[in-house]
Each structure stands twice: as structure tokens, then as C-alpha cells.
């Protein structure tokens, strides 16, 4: 059983849904990211998504694009992110997902990257621009290393796509709540709960919902239907305003509030 499966199983036993938090690795630098991950876990995050910065993040809105730019400007590389995860594994067993685009993995080499990521203590990869039908090579590599490979579903995914993702994915399935790019929204889509319930019925893996969730109230609303809630852009915005100890304090307070929202939605 993977760390991710273990975490979802223990949450299910307690009748809780998962809070998944996203931050960009290396924003503003990797030393800060290390402290941030530990603070996110302390404040209530159940899983951590670390964004791999990329120069052309087509699925991301301006908040995460700017975060990616800051991380690249500080010299963040894929090998350095793996070194960060290795350091974190000396301090925490929180499940860590690397989320990003296929180009940096392709440049690194899929098999070598999967091996190195597993050795570092990464639990899963989520490659935004790699659909199941193009993922055979990476899937083989992750399977051989014991890494989960997470795929996306969207509001426009049909039955065959849902079946394909259910067959090939592991860890959990990530449901994108809205079409378009990442970014905080003022409200959750009216039909989200019904659609999530429908999709969830076709899956054995946990279904987490992300894109656009920015308040504890929205997190609770989504948690009523899903197995977990992802918050990204709303967290990343704090990196534009704060730094150092104040950044950690602000992030911790916000994540604690999000966790309370998720707990309310779990009941």
C-alpha cells in the first residue's frame, strides 16, 4: 500500500475527507519550500502537491504562472526538487505528489526520473499534459518503481475517458472542477456536486476536486461530494504578499481554516 492509499484509508476510517494543498517548488526558493511543506502539514494538509516550475504552463492561470516564473528565476531544477523531497523525508511522511508538465520529465528521461523520484521519496506524479493514451512509457516506469500515476478528469470527460483513467490511474483521480486554467473562483459551479457524485460512482480510487477552490466554505461544499479537495492558487497568492516567518504564519492560518471547512463538509 502506498503512502497515498494509506492516507486515504485512514481518513476514511475517521469519516474525513482529504485536504490537498498545492505550492510551487522553489517559490521563492527551495529552502522556503521545505519550511512551507512542514507548515502545511502541521496546519492540517493531508497531502502535498509540489508544482514543478515550467516556462510554458498552459493549464495554469496568472497566479501559478508568476509563481513558476519566480521559482525558475531562483534556479529551481528538477534534480534540486528531488533533493528537497529527500530532505523532507528525514522530517515527514506526508504524501508528496509532483505535479507539472511532461517536457521536463521527457528531458530528464522517463525511466530515470521515475526511479530517482521514487528513491527521493516522491509518492506520485501528476502530469497535466499527459493523457492516459500517451502515458504507456511513463506508466511502465512508475509501476516498476512503486510510484502512483495520477490522471485528470474534467467536466467534459465522457464515459470512455472516465473508464480509461479508472483503469490506468493509481493513488487518486484528480477532477478539474471547471474548464479553463487554474485560479481562484468566487463560487463553486452549481452542477459540481451532481457531476462529482456521478463520476465517483464509476471509480474505485478516491476522487479529489481542484481548480478554483479558494475559501473554507467552498472547500466544505466540495468535500460533501468528493473524497478530497485541492487548494492551489489561493495558497500561492500568499507568496506574492509575504515572506519569511510571516509567510509561514499566514499560510498556516489559512490552511487551518481550510481544514476546518473540509471537516465540516465531511460530516
UniProtKB/Swiss-Prot annotation:
Its EC number is 4.2.1.20. The active site is at residues 49, 60. Pathway: Amino-acid biosynthesis; L-tryptophan biosynthesis; L-tryptophan from chorismate: step 5/5. It comes from the Bacteria. The keyword Kinase does not apply. SUPFAM superfamilies: Ribulose-phoshate binding barrel. It catalyses: (1S,2R)-1-C-(indol-3-yl)glycerol 3-phosphate + L-serine = D-glyceraldehyde 3-phosphate + L-tryptophan + H2O. Keywords: Amino-acid biosynthesis, Aromatic amino acid biosynthesis, Lyase, Tryptophan biosynthesis. InterPro entries: Aldolase_TIM, RibuloseP-bd_barrel, Trp_synthase_alpha_AS, Trp_synthase_suA. GO terms for cellular component: cytosol. Tetramer of two alpha and two beta chains. Belongs to the TrpA family. The alpha subunit is responsible for the aldol cleavage of indoleglycerol phosphate to indole and glyceraldehyde 3-phosphate. This is Tryptophan synthase alpha chain. It comes from Citrifermentans bemidjiense (strain ATCC BAA-1014 / DSM 16622 / JCM 12645 / Bem) (Geobacter bemidjiensis). The lineage of its organism: Bacteria, Pseudomonadati, Thermodesulfobacteriota, Desulfuromonadia, Geobacterales. The gene is trpA.
